[in-house]
Amino acid sequence: MSKTESRKLSDDYEVVDVLGRGGFSIVRRGVSKSEEKTQVAIKTLRRLGPAMAGMKQGTKPVPGSGLPMWKQVSISDALLTNEILVMRRIVESVAPHPNVINLHDVYEDVHGVHLVLELCSGGELFDRIVGRDRYSEFDAACVIRQIASGLEALHKASIVHRDLKPENCLFSDKDEKSTLKIMDFGLSSVEDFSDPIVALFGSIDYVSPEALSRQEVSAASDMWSVGVILYILLSGCPPFHAATNREKQQRILQGEFSFQDHTWKTISSSAKDLISRLLSVQPYKRPTASDLLRHPWVIGDCAKQDLMDAEVVSKLQKFNARRKLRAAAIASVLSCKVALRTKRLRNLLGTHDLTSEELDNLRLHFGRICADGENATLSEFEQVLRAMKMDSLIPLAPRVFDLFDNNRDGTVDMREILCGFSSLRNSRGDDALRLCFQMYDADRSGCISKEELASMLRALPEECLPGDITEPGKLDEVFDQMDADSDGKVTFDEFKAAMNKDSALQDVLLSSLRPQ
């Protein structure tokens, strides 16, 4: 890896299409300009706070160089810093490893930090599994063996993933024998670094008892997550069921699960014994990743090769679709942020009401003038207003800009401003839903992908979140109220239907967006 500090990302890579977006990051496909024309994934972590230090453009992280330990950082800043720190440790102590995503290079510029990563084009773990008609214990053991191999290397390097779930396990390519890679280290932790902030994130299905009770999280916590993944692979549903999310938390804390469903009757006793050990409430009783790699079932010696009941795949398909609809529930929470910004914007701009044509022109001018394409500086925002001959708003530009510069980095996300202006004109419940949907339908495909939604909550300041939504697992409870059959494609109609299923739920999430 070159140590030339003057290199730019564009010197070495051609950036092609967008693969996914998050609350503060974007992942794009890149092609190296070398003779090999290697395809990579370029994850850009947007600069949200002080300029990053400790990683120079185009250089491999230097052992001992360190990263700034900011005493007071936002959630996004903590995640950004944390992911870079963990990826640096992976480069130093893990890579190359067949089951851990590989970091090729690091660049830094005014737009943020660019991680040039190995491209995994084979899809997510569960997406690959549900694509089959049936599979065997032996196939499941192969999956667990690869996850354990990656975790063994990470744990030896004192890295705890902390967010291990099917979405973070991707296949290298679409080949049937493709290797499985562990990725997404935004919530991971390493020794000598303060714990990342995790209170706002996702499902509790894979969260260990010690993490739920805010006790010390260790490598054993990752092993609990492996146990949950294995249980789902062999049964098609998660191990902890309950009528309410609070009950689910209690069952996790007490380790209450069973093998009573009829689909478990054909599963080998060795597999069930392994799950029971992995889902031990006491962390010290769980096998390590190294233990798993020596386990007869994981090795394949006693894993059945007979195809499992087709009902297992059917259940897994429904669980996978349900998981993706959870992303739609998270998207609806974004409405709270839109409502807050819209109210302030309305007060600021008074009676100025953009027409539909003006809104379309606003979008076009943003795309033409903003060099970044997504984030704009104050100067670019003023250029947009001038181009639209909206001179009366130019004196207000700094105040409007400041309203949306949530991270105080001197740039704003143009999608938020567009959504805010749109909400001045269209603030009814259904329109709010559509705005929420369109805002993160980045490719305008009419379908929100999992990648577009996965980091939705990361974009929300805590003060914009409703009520107790930040409590561990609360989003699962919201989702459970919206539960419906799905084919896994989150179209607007599906999104709207999920919200309209429960009028009380819609009142909670959308009332603030209705006309006052």
UniProtKB/Swiss-Prot annotation:
Q: What is its EC number?
A: 2.7.11.17
Q: What is its main location?
A: nucleus
Residue positions binding ATP: 19-27, 43
PTMs per UniProt: Autophosphorylation.
Tell me the Gene Ontology biological-process terms attached to this UniProt entry.
intracellular signal transduction; nodulation
Coiled coil feature spans: 343-363
Any one GO molecular-function label of the UniProt entry: ATP binding
Q: Which domain of life is it from?
A: Eukaryota
Catalysed reaction, written as an equation: L-seryl-[protein] + ATP = O-phospho-L-seryl-[protein] + ADP + H(+); L-threonyl-[protein] + ATP = O-phospho-L-threonyl-[protein] + ADP + H(+)
Q: How does it sit in the membrane?
A: Peripheral membrane protein
Modification type Phosphothreonine: residues: 263
Instruction: Name the residues annotated as catalytic in the UniProt entry.
Output: 163
Expression induction: Not induced by mycorrhization. Induced by hydrogen peroxide, abscisic acid (ABA) and dehydration.
Tissue note? Mainly expressed in roots and panicles. Detected in leaves, shoots and culms.
Q: Which of UniProt's keywords are assigned here? A: ATP-binding, Calcium, Calmodulin-binding, Cell membrane, Coiled coil, Cytoplasm, Kinase, Membrane, Metal-binding, Nodulation, Nucleotide-binding, Nucleus, Phosphoprotein, Repeat, Serine/threonine-protein kinase, Transferase
Ligand binding (Ca(2+) 3): 483, 485, 487, 489, 494
In this chain, Ca(2+) 2 is annotated as bound at: 441, 443, 445, 447, 452
For the Protein kinase domain, which residue ranges apply? 13-298
Which SMART domains does the entry link to?
EFh, S_TKc
Domain (EF-hand): give its ranges: 392-427, 428-463, 470-505
Task: List the InterPro entries hit by this protein, alphabetically.
Answer: CDPK_Ser/Thr_kinases, EF-hand-dom_pair, EF_Hand_1_Ca_BS, EF_hand_dom, Kinase-like_dom_sf, Prot_kinase_dom, Protein_kinase_ATP_BS, Ser/Thr_kinase_AS
Extra information: Can restore mycorrhizal and rhizobial symbiosis and induces spontaneous nodulation in a Ljccamk mutant of Lotus japonicus. Can restore nodulation and mycorrhizal symbiosis to a Medicago truncatula dmi3 mutant.
PANTHER family recorded: SERINE/THREONINE-PROTEIN KINASE (PTHR24349)
What family does the entry list? Answer: Belongs to the protein kinase superfamily. CAMK Ser/Thr protein kinase family. CaMK subfamily.
Q: What is the protein named? A: Calcium and calcium/calmodulin-dependent serine/threonine-protein kinase
> What is the organism field in this record?
Oryza sativa subsp. japonica
Q: Which gene encodes it?
A: CCAMK
